[in-house]
């Protein structure tokens, strides 16, 4: 069972839940940038939520299924067609052997996910198939995909899986925006509705002046072109510090908001480094990282502080949404 890459688009990689437990050795976790869309895709095709998928950035890939395959598309929606017939997102679909899936440019959002029954079965490295392009490990030879690549698919009884899906009438697109990840906290700023990223105070929040902390939660920030899978660099009112931005390097997690010497926030994403030497004013909660991962350069965001207990509650609520879909299968 396999998939052949005909056109990889700008950036398509194999990703899973990430390489956990090796930060002390300098290995980054990597994994899907939009963890919610990633998990939802897997549960739609009957996989374990941690199975490997394809992540496409800005524009999707063109792929040929070499065997009958159940698949699902989630994340940033783009025009998609299977053998020239339009197909929806957020629905289990059946591709026959030899069928070609073509994905266009995302209409909104940034990253799309293709999950297949059985999962992408490239060799795991340190317990994960996640591609780390900078380190050259995971995925397919530790690199982004190119035309002509062949990706193995894990063992799956496709006929039985599709029969179970159709018998339960699950082969229809999900319409609930909350379940599809389409509902995110927003804030009214003047005449605008802006994505609101919730955060807990960072380990060095005391390094910032009262005015600096106020500017952080009341300001508007624009995503700069310097955004990738590693981090989103923002531009807005410079945040005032009591002393310089540099600190003794310490640990970094997804969502860490470092502030560079120019006073601008940098929010860490999936490919973040393991340590950093800039003061961290906040940490974006895990439930809101999928929202950030789908924003494009030029879009604007704002922040608010929440308590750790509210952060845990939001994570549990988000997990319950995709678990609801899993329970139906």
Q: PLM features: residue spans?
A:
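Conserved "landmark" site that anchors the functional core of diverse proteins
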Residues: 1-329
């Amino acid at each position: 069972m396999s998939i052949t890459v005909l056109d990889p688009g700008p950036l398509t990689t194999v990703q899973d839940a990430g390489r956990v437990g090796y930060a002390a050795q300098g290995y980054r976790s990597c994994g899907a940038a939009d963890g919610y869309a990633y998990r939802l895709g897997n549960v739609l095709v009957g996989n374990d939520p941690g199975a490997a998928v394809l992540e496409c950035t800005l524009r999707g890939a063109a792929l040929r299924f070499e065997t009958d395959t159940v698949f699902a598309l989630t994340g940033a929606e783009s025009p998609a067609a299977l053998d020239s017939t339009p197909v929806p997102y957020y629905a289990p679909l059946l591709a026959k052997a030899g069928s070609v899936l073509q994905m266009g440019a995302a209409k909104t959002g940034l990253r799309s996910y293709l999950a297949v029954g059985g999962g992408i079965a490239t060799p795991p490295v340190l317990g994960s198939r996640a591609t780390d392009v900078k380190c050259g490990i995971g995925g397919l030879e530790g690199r982004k995909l190119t035309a002509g690549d062949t990706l193995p698919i894990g063992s799956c009884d496709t006929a039985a899986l599709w029969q179970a899906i159709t018998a339960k009438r699950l082969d229809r697109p999900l319409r609930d925006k909350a379940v599809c990840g389409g509902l995110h906290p927003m804030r009214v700023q003047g005449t605008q509705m802006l994505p609101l990223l919730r955060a807990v105070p960072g380990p060095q929040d005391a390094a910032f002046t009262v005015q600096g902390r106020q500017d952080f939660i009341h300001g508007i920030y624009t995503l700069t072109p310097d955004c990738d899978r590693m981090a989103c660099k923002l531009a807005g009112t410079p945040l005032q510090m009591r002393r310089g931005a540099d600190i003794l390097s310490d640990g970094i997690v997804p969502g860490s908001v470092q502030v560079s010497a120019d006073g601008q926030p940098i929010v860490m994403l999936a490919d973040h480094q393991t340590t950093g030497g800039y003061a961290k004013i906040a940490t974006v909660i895990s439930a809101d990282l999928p929202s950030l991962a789908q924003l494009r350069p030029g879009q604007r965001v704002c922040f608010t502080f929440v308590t750790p207990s509210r952060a845990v509650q939001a994570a549990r609520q988000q997990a319950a949404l995709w678990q609801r879909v899993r329970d139906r299968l």
